[in-house]
Amino acid sequence: MAFTQALVTVLALLAGTLPHRHSENSPPKKANGDKCVHHTQCSSDCCLIDLERSGAFCTPKSRIGMGCLPQTKGSLNIMCPCRSGLNCHSKDPTCPRRCQMI
């Protein structure tokens, strides 16, 4: 009986502390062009550093033929990963990676 009560208490604590993916309290995703500090804030999942505009802004993922990075690491990007259905690839190690259909 004590084990069951302890288990219920632990589950209740975990349920209250774990973030919900689609909670009513979670802020809406930002549109392209909006300022951001982390890629998860953007509806495109890409927060790109823009030195000319002195900040970071949500931007669309890279299209076919555009420069890319294979994945998002950290909170900000210097290049965005590819859109769905494209792969970030380079045929030659000395050439920059580009989004391609493979």
Curated annotation (Swiss-Prot):
The entry's keywords: Disulfide bond, Secreted, Signal
PROSITE patterns for the chain: COLIPASE_2 (PS51342)
Disulfide bonds: C36-C47, C42-C58, C46-C80, C68-C88, C82-C99
A biological-process GO annotation: lipid catabolic process
Subcellular location: Secreted
InterPro entries found in the cross-reference section: Colipase
Residues of the signal peptide: 1-23
Main localization of the protein described in the UniProt heading: secreted
Family the UniProt entry places it in: Belongs to the colipase family.
Stated name of the protein: Colipase-like protein 2
Source species of the chain: Mus musculus (Mouse)
Gene transcribed to yield this protein: Clpsl2
